[in-house]
């Protein structure tokens, strides 16, 4: 049974959301909410001096709206933000009065049982320089929204504590104090804003959110530190316009079972197996666990054996030639398979082994293709094939017309 979880960020609180009090907020920039988010709101980013003025100590440990109220209470002078930031300030009185809306949002985590399985073993999420999607993906279902009101749905990932971890003796343990925080970003669902009726009619999924350890990332990915524990948070904002975010009602929901440790490669074999068993893109690692290349090689050898047997039945007089050339072709194809893997771009979002080498995978495919090209062009003129072709010409009394069909019927020249 899915039930909404309360936010454990504030000890002792019994509320699952944190409403914003608009009458306490004077004018301030939208960047107080979103921080550094050039991929999502390039025009709303503050200059360096403005960003520094709005940074609050310990802000990441507070709910979103506590950060907003804290920024408002600092009473930052309008002129200190510079001309660029001042251009994006909107007085509260210029906003349209919000219509009376009655709602009682409740959020249910999808695939709760799967998340709990991972949580019991210590969930790990791989982070890479090029960005990696989460598995299980973060999906929720919302109820209790006003059907006509518009909402913006957001997600962010914050540090769960101030510790660094290591995997030792088959368990996670504290290894020291946490590294300095990475720049924080909020991921706004691409369908925002939408009416409550639209949100409630479907599962809200954040499967496109990507995790990275590249501090210079410019794609809007969530930047995390490896070997640190993190907690995803989900936010519901009632607003018809993104520019009204600072003055809108925020509700924050936290599901403890979605907590995870960021890693560059999976540490716990049990987590690796869970991901293989439940991720639809992990078919190549099931059963034997040998990976795609080994499976391709086995399929190639099996198909060549069938082909060889069929050729023996059709051409009994050229058994010797077929055996020699087929043996070489089997060896060439098994060592250099040329069949590309299906679904490689999607599959690399999961597995820690060969797919973690994002740049190497493309090079490997090109290398396989080039090597196979060389082998296939030399097979027809390989020294093993030449004596057999010579013997065939002798048995046909030297007639050119008979020698050509014999050569073209061998597996090496097809």
Curated annotation (Swiss-Prot):
Q: Which GO terms describe its biological process?
A: anterior/posterior axis specification, embryo; cell fate specification; cellular senescence; embryonic digit morphogenesis; embryonic forelimb morphogenesis; female genitalia development; follicle-stimulating hormone secretion; luteinizing hormone secretion
Recorded coiled-coil stretches: none
Keyword Calcium belongs to the record:
no
* Annotated keywords: Developmental protein, DNA-binding, Nucleus, Repressor, Transcription, Transcription regulation
- Coarse class of the primary localization is nucleus
Cellular compartments annotated: Nucleus
Q: Which GO terms describe its cellular component?
A: chromatin; nucleus
Gene3D superfamilies found in the cross-reference section:
Transcription factor, T-box
Positions of the DNA-binding region: 114-287
What would be an example GO MF term here? DNA-binding transcription factor activity, RNA polymerase II-specific
Residues spanning the membrane: none
Question: Carries keyword Zinc-finger?
Answer: no
Which residue stretches belong to region Disordered?
359-414
Known role: Transcriptional repressor involved in developmental processes. Binds to the palindromic T site 5'-TTCACACCTAGGTGTGAA-3' DNA sequence, or a half-site, which are present in the regulatory region of several genes. Probably plays a role in limb pattern formation.
Question: PANTHER family from the entry?
Answer: T-BOX PROTEIN-RELATED (PTHR11267), T-BOX TRANSCRIPTION FACTOR TBX3 (PTHR11267:SF91)
What is the name listed in the Swiss-Prot or TrEMBL entry for this protein?
Answer: T-box transcription factor TBX3
Q: Which organism is it from?
A: Gallus gallus
Encoding gene (name)? TBX3
